[in-house]
């Protein structure tokens, strides 16, 4: 185990806080990603990492009272809230495309975690 359970939990919550902080910053102070594909890829990657951290913590017992599907739905709700709160931030707007990329990253993390779990179960 490269990272201890406690450390992984803190990394996940710090990552979530960083997502929320960056999305709370007015757009005029952030670097501009003019390329649509680059912005979409950034959203997908950020939420892929969050999902991988979430499901790794689940595998290690942090959220074991919830199913992986329940955690995915909670993360999707958080992504939607994160996108929705940007309506209150100067020069920011809600983007359905950004939300779709966020959900895509979470879904990809979900399927990766299922694949890893199945591989692990077969090898035991």
Over which residues does each language-model region extend?
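"…centered on the first transmembrane helix and the immediately adjacent amphipathic helix/loop
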Residues: 1-57, 71
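Transmembrane helix-loop-helix hairpins at the membrane interface
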Residues: 68, 92-93, 110
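Membrane-interfacial alpha-helical segments at the cytosolic side of multi-pass membrane proteins
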Residues: 45-61, 104-120
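Hydrophobic alpha-helical segments of small multi-pass membrane proteins
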Residues: 72, 76, 102-107
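Interfacial helix-loop-helix junctions of multi-pass membrane proteins
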Residues: 33-38, 79-103
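Membrane-interface helix-boundary motifs at transmembrane edges
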Residues: 1-6, 59-66, 122
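Membrane-embedded alpha-helical segments that form the functional core of polytopic membrane enzymes
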Residues: 64-80
């Amino acid at each position: 185990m490269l990272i201890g359970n406690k450390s992984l939990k803190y990394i996940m919550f710090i990552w979530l806080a960083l997502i929320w902080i960056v999305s709370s910053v007015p757009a005029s102070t952030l670097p501009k990603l003019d390329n649509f594909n680059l912005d979409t890829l950034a959203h997908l990657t950020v939420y892929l990492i969050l999902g991988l951290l979430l499901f790794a913590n689940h595998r290690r017992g942090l959220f074991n009272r919830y199913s992986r599907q329940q955690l995915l739905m909670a993360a999707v709700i958080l992504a939607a809230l994160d996108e929705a709160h940007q309506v209150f931030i100067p020069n920011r707007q809600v983007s359905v495309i950004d939300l779709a990329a966020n959900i895509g990253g979470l879904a990809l993390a979900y399927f990766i975690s299922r694949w890893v779990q199945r591989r692990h179960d077969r090898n035991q």
